């Protein structure tokens, strides 16, 4: 069975909360990377978005890159992610099937209006965590840090997203090569 990390929302009341989709996704990826085992260092456990944010940018807010997230998580939790840009969809799919999780960059306008929409009215760049792929229908278990059920019409993550939706959202991310995904992968934990 694939290890499933604790869901982390980005709107947690901490500094930069509503800009912490990347740190929240990385927190979940770091917990998966270590399969829930505390590295027994002087940093908190389990991983939290605010701690990753403070390691990356202690005095400012804003978007984060996959490299920044990796550097913060490596410092805090000794989780060295495999950061890749322009990963062909078939390669992404095979890496998830093989037992890796991934922080994935998406364009949220693709998700808008679906039952997976965690922030109606938000259309920008976003970070999510993908934990696994279901064999029966090819859906992906997505931990969207916006899906925290803060209102009755906001879903609670994680959710099983259809592969077509995940692919469209990832391929629509500005700067992504056609047919490709920008992602940061955990080690194979299976």
Labelled PLM ranges:
Residues 24-36, 72-79, 95-98:
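Structured segments of extracytoplasmic/periplasmic soluble domains
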Residues 121-122, 133-190:
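Noncatalytic regulatory segments and standalone regulatory/sensor domains
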Residues 62-86:
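Mid-length scaffold segments of soluble, non-membrane domains
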Residues 1-63, 118, 135-137, 189:
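Active-site-adjacent structural segments surrounding the nucleophilic cysteine of cysteine proteases
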